[in-house]
């Protein structure tokens, strides 16, 4: 879930717009995960349009409602942070706290978040750990205070582990220069997120039997049953990507 959109803009500083960075991170994460089997990846947005168009609630709650409709195993929301203290830097995980309500959700968000953070740290990003925040005026059915952040709270209510990854601070020049400035830097963040997800769920790389076919000048990968394969395919030790809609080699 790439956070924000053109209508609901995120943080902005040092020439960086959060909604743009989030989208690049999300796409990179999706593309890397598509190399693996036993996983179906959905992305809440592929452009900067508002998610209200899905008719699943407002832009924020539509993200959780989509995950619920898809019976998702988890929802990972990509963000970058901002703070008035321009020296503050590092990544942070916003996860469900141990409220005792739908306990599986808090346990999973914390374990999955730890796996993702470990891979972000390998890029040199400082870890600010977990941030747990609650509401004073809303409670879960067991009487415990509800989680503050909508993505996290709705995940608890829907029994779908939902967490937010803050990849660093747009207000910090060093974080911007090292992690947000270029497309390759943003891709690295998305790949790190994907590796954390892969490690947590113990996913295996795809190895599809089949071969290349050229039809009307366009190259496809066709499996043994004659199906054109989209996404990433490994052939003779090399990875090839085929358009997710047309299945044509990119």
Predicted segment positions?
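Conserved beta-strand scaffold positions in the cores of enzyme catalytic domains, especially
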Residues: 41-43, 75, 151, 162-164, ...
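General small-molecule cofactor/ligand-binding pocket signal
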Residues: 42-44, 131, 221
């Amino acid at each position: 879930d790439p956070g924000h959109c053109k209508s609901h803009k995120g943080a902005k500083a040092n020439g960086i717009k959060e909604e743009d960075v989030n989208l690049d991170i999300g796409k990179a994460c999706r593309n890397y995960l598509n190399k693996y089997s036993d996983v179906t990846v959905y992305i809440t947005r592929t452009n900067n349009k508002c998610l209200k168009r899905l008719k699943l609630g407002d832009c924020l709650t539509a993200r959780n409602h989509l995950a619920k409709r898809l019976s998702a195993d988890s929802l990972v929301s990509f963000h970058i942070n901002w703070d008035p203290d321009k020296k503050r830097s590092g990544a942070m995980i916003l996860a469900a706290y141990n409220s005792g309500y739908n306990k599986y959700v808090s346990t999973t968000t914390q374990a999955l978040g730890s796996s993702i953070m470990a891979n972000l740290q390998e890029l040199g990003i400082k870890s600010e750990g977990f941030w747990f925040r609650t509401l004073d005026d809303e409670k879960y059915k067991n009487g415990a205070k509800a989680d503050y952040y909508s993505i996290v709270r709705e995940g608890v209510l829907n029994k779908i582990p939902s967490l937010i990854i803050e990849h660093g601070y747009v207000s910090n020049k060093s974080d911007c220069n090292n992690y947000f400035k270029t497309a390759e830097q943003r891709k690295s963040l998305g790949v790190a997120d994907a590796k954390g997800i892969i490690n947590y769920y113990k996913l295996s790389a795809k190895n599809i039997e089949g071969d290349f076919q050229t039809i009307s000048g366009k190259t496809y990968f066709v499996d043994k049953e004659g199906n054109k394969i989209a996404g990433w395919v490994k052939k003779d030790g090399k990875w090839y990507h085929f358009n997710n809609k047309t299945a044509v080699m990119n």
